[in-house]
């Protein structure tokens, strides 16, 4: 049950008679890769692990224990606990080498601050605990260097550059409302690169279109946490095309140079872009958030282009059977013009987005 599962990382045969291998096989037959979501640093009080090793959890002796989300944090300063947590991941990957992705979650802060292992060295707990986590992650990375892992911690609570040595991406926030995400992703990108920022299309804020939600997520590492049954035929087609476009352009988006053009904190719109290092390809994102009545719409001035090159402008990520109303669409401009004069891409529509591809000719 949910009250006693954390810590006991064993397959429930009554629920999964074929175990994880059957899930991996089923996913493969459906044409997708299989990923798994784990929270190996935590333990529930009614788990077999806690009953066998109560001294493996961080908790105060002779005090009433406070349970956050009915869980405790394992004491990663303890080498035996490090071995256990490594073993959780190692066993899964050893038995299921085709597992293609790990989401590593951490949903509780450290409470009941006391390490049974450190005894009279309690002042070292926070430091030794974090070092223990990184020791585990290094062992995993050394043995399984090609398995991508996402770090999630109640959202983005544990994002740091040391973690980037071991994780391929961060879950920026549990808030996936696309309007809020514009602000979150704008701020997050001040510190971390786009390729480290997970951004998923979800059901939050259904007042916004699937296109808008997808265009917001596609400015980072695009993903979907959305049931296909929630989408109509046109929306499914749109998502398929948007994923194809993102996949085609992801080298520019994830590895190109990022330019923040219009901040959402300064008004009712947002825009940023990515340009390839050779300046031959760029992707421009524009978002209308909550335009005011009669608001003057200013052109978006691009950056990072070659002033002497000519660029073909093309709006992509369009809904089926719709046409672009972008005045610059399918036209060619010099990089100098695009950076000094710009493109009239903003509109007076609420929660409206454009994705624009620029190609040097």
Where on the chain are the PLM-derived regions?
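Glycan-recognition surfaces
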Residues: 44-45, 49-83, 127-230
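C-terminal beta-sandwich/jelly-roll accessory domains of carbohydrate-active enzymes
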Residues: 290-361
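Active-site groove signature of glycoside hydrolases
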Residues: 84-118
């Amino acid at each position: 049950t949910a009250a006693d599962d954390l810590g006991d990382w064993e397959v429930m045969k009554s629920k999964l008679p074929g175990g994880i291998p059957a899930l991996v096989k089923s996913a493969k037959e459906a044409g997708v890769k299989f990923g798994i979501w784990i929270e190996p640093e935590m333990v529930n009080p009614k788990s077999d692990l806690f009953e066998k090793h109560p001294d493996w959890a961080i908790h105060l002796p002779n005090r009433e224990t406070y349970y956050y989300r009915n869980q405790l944090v394992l004491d990663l300063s303890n080498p035996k606990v490090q071995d256990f947590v490594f073993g959780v991941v190692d066993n899964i990957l050893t038995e299921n080498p085709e597992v293609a992705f790990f989401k590593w979650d951490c949903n509780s802060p450290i409470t009941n601050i006391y390490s049974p292992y450190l005894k009279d060295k309690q002042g070292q707990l926070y430091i030794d605990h974090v070092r223990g986590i990184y020791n585990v992650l290094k062992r995993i990375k050394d043995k399984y260097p090609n398995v991508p892992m996402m770090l999630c911690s109640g959202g983005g609570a544990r994002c740091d550059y040391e973690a980037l040595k071991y994780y391929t991406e961060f879950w920026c926030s549990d808030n996936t409302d696309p309007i809020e995400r514009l602000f979150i992703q704008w701020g997050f990108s001040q510190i971390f690169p786009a390729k480290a920022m997970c951004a998923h299309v979800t059901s939050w804020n259904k007042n916004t279109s699937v296109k808008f939600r997808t265009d917001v997520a596609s400015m980072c590492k695009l993903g979907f946490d959305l049931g296909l049954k929630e989408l109509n035929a046109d929306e499914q087609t749109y998502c398929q095309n948007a994923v194809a476009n993102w996949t085609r352009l992801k080298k520019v988006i994830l590895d190109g140079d990022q330019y923040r053009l219009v901040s959402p904190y300064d008004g009712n719109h947002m825009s940023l872009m990515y340009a390839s290092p050779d300046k031959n390809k760029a992707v421009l994102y524009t978002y209308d958030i909550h335009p005011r009545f009669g608001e003057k719409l200013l052109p978006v001035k691009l950056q990072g282009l070659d002033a002497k090159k000519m660029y073909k402008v093309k709006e992509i990520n369009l809904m089926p059977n719709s046409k672009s109303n972008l005045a610059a669409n399918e036209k060619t401009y010099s990089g100098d013009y695009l950076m000094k004069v710009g493109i009239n891409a903003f509109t007076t529509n609420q929660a409206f987005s454009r994705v624009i591809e620029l190609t040097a000719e």
